[in-house]
Structure formats: C-alpha cells, structure tokens
Amino acid sequence: MSLPAPDRRMGGWTGVGYDDIEMGRTYPAQPLPISAEDVARFYRSLGEARPPPAIGTRIPAFLLNEIRALKKQMKFPPGVLHAREEIEMRSAARLGEPLTVSITIANKYIRNDRRFIVFDQHVRCATDQRSIMTIKHILYWPC
C-alpha cells in the first residue's frame, strides 16, 4: 500500500511529521492551572454575569478540555485539524485543586489518504490522583 503524499500547501515548517510520531509514547504529567479569572472569563464569554467564583467552585468541564499540554511537547505542522473527540467525565474538578494532565499517543492511522493521530488526555487531581476527565482526541495530521 502506498502512502499518501504529505500535504504541504500550508508552506514550510520544522515540526513533527507523521512518520516521527511514536505510538504508545506517554509524556510526563503537566500542571493544568485553572484560575478564578479563567472561570469568570468562561462565564462572561457565555454572556453570564456571575459573582467571582470562590475556592471549591466546580470548574466547567469545557476549561479542562484543551490541547496546550500536547502542543508544549511537540510542534504541530500547519493545517492540523481537530477531527473528533470523545470525553468521559469522571469527577468534578474544583477551583483551588491542583490539576495535572497527561498525554499518550494512542494510535495513528491513514484513512481515505489522510493521516490521523489519536491521543489520550487524562486530567487528574494532583492531591489525591482522582480521575477527573479523559479525552480521546483525533487530529488530522497533514504531513
């Protein structure tokens, strides 16, 4: 089976190519800081005027689902697209709890002449290692 040609329409880059991505690679857990201002900004973006959140307030799950942790570990090529995700919420995260996020490259595959990378993200409470959320991201990887 021949591999599709890399899609380099977005111009030159010096990032991580599809062939360089190692399935099964796990990156060290990183802090996932969420501040009261982050929570307040989230609600303002929805048009809600709320009082400043207090320590112990539940963090909206949307704020925990991010790919900055992976972008800190590898440089994305131009043209990466978020194709799909699956989220499993296991426990509430509370403002003031130290959170961590770990990343594992779960799979990579070619479908319809397009390259895809699957990575699993796991958010935990650093204090008691409680599982907060797992997210399976599927990204289109152009080259």
Which positions does each model-derived feature cover?
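Low-complexity, compositionally biased segments
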Residues: 22-23, 88, 140
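HotDog/MaoC-like acyl-thioester-processing domains
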Residues: 1-16, 93-143
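Residues in flexible loops and secondary-structure boundaries
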Residues: 29, 35, 40-42, 89-90, ...
